[in-house]
Amino acid sequence: MSPALPEVMTAGFTGADGGQSFAPGATIGIMGGGQLGRMTALAAARLGYRCHVYCPDADSPASQVTSATTVAPYDDEDALKRFADAVDVVTFEFENIPDSAAAFLATRKPTRPKPFVLHICQQRLREKDFLSLNGVPVTKYLPVPEREALDEAVRRLGPPAILKSAQFGYDGKGQVRIATDTDLADAWRRMGGTLGILEAEVDFALEA
């Protein structure tokens, strides 16, 4: 288990969330302006909600289908405050919104999900630790904090396995399949040469 999990559970994220629901006509603040934010905004509009996007990019896909956009870095507290003042509830398009921004917004408006959930989802070791702690079956896994640790992790788990970057990998990026003949130094480089996780390969019939 990685040492980060106890910190997650005791991080003390506070929020302005009384558990209330929001009727059509409310404004949903979406952190992130990509394709997922665009789909969220379009679905929300069909249900009668308005959306306000916060994104560092001026012409993001989500901002093209919403009436309001705040264009600013995720660490701009003045812009975050103006954004919070303009919306009723905040959600996140993707998991890699900085912790500090999520926590800042949660002190001003309800957030869905809560910041600690975002914190867990941002890092694969935290995800696996959290799921294991709560009794959810996961494949065998080991942290790979440095290149030298990869050899021992492969020895313990054995190929086939998947080496993944702990953060920011998606759609197959930052992932390398480890077979018996894989050059581990090359695999480490292709993964990104950063904190990683080695997961035993799962023989599954389908993904639902």
Language-model segments: residues:
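Short, structured secondary-structure boundary patches
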Residues: 71-77, 114, 131-136, 159-164, ...
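Conserved ATP-binding module of the ATP-grasp superfamily
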Residues: 137-139, 160-163, 176-208
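Structured helix-beta-strand junction loops
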Residues: 47, 86, 107-108, 134, ...
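Glycine-/Pro-rich loop/turn segments that contact NAD(P) or position catalytic residues
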Residues: 119-160, 167, 171, 175-178
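Solvent-exposed alpha-helices and their adjacent loops that cap or buttress functional pockets
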Residues: 19-23, 62-63, 154-155, 167-170, ...
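Short secondary-structure boundary segments
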Residues: 94-95, 165-166, 200
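CheY-like receiver
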Residues: 82-83, 130, 152-153, 187-190
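ATP-binding N-terminal substructure of ATP-dependent carboxylate-amine bond-forming enzymes
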Residues: 1-129, 148
